[in-house]
Amino acid sequence: FNLAYAKKFSQSISGGLNLKVVSMALPNARAQGIALDAGIRYVTGDQEHVKFSISLKNIGPPLSFSGDGLSIDMLNPSTSISIGMQQRVSSYELPSQLNIGASYDFNFNENQKLIIACSFSANSFSKDQFRGGAEYTLKTEKASFTLRGGFVYEQSLFNSIEVSTALSGPSGGFSFNFPFGESGSDIGIDYAYRQSIFGGVHSVGARINIGE
């Protein structure tokens, strides 16, 4: 269950809240609670080309499991009578996360654009991460081309034993877009690569947009 609210406070500032129910279940045991996500975005510049954002995720009280799955039967050695007992469990915190990001758009002209972005993620149960990336787009009358690249860094990134996530290191990709007809239809081809400790992932896609 999610309940979200978003509002644009001014031409430059917008924000949102998301209240959600968090539930985790094991055989005959369950932990349930609520958590909050919140974020705010600021846009400035003559062409709205400078953007800042900050968000908090999974903010909420600790959770703990309860249910019949925690009950055990033990034999009282003095009376030889079986007694039902409830195991004590410790509560645990949600994996909260703080994200801070910024981007800058270089609008060279109507046909060329470069976007540079960076972000920082502070994780409560894993290593903090720094991200950086860029996207360049070139448009012509017959086609448009987009080139993308990025990098995710965390401590001990190049140590295969101590690295905490597979989704780190370099990534890149490109897109071709070919318009056809007079109704705004186009055909697109996308390719992306992401490095991981498992050898990397290649993704290829194609799309067709039919105009009115």
What are these model-predicted stretches?
Residues 1-212:
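Outer-membrane beta-barrel porins/channels
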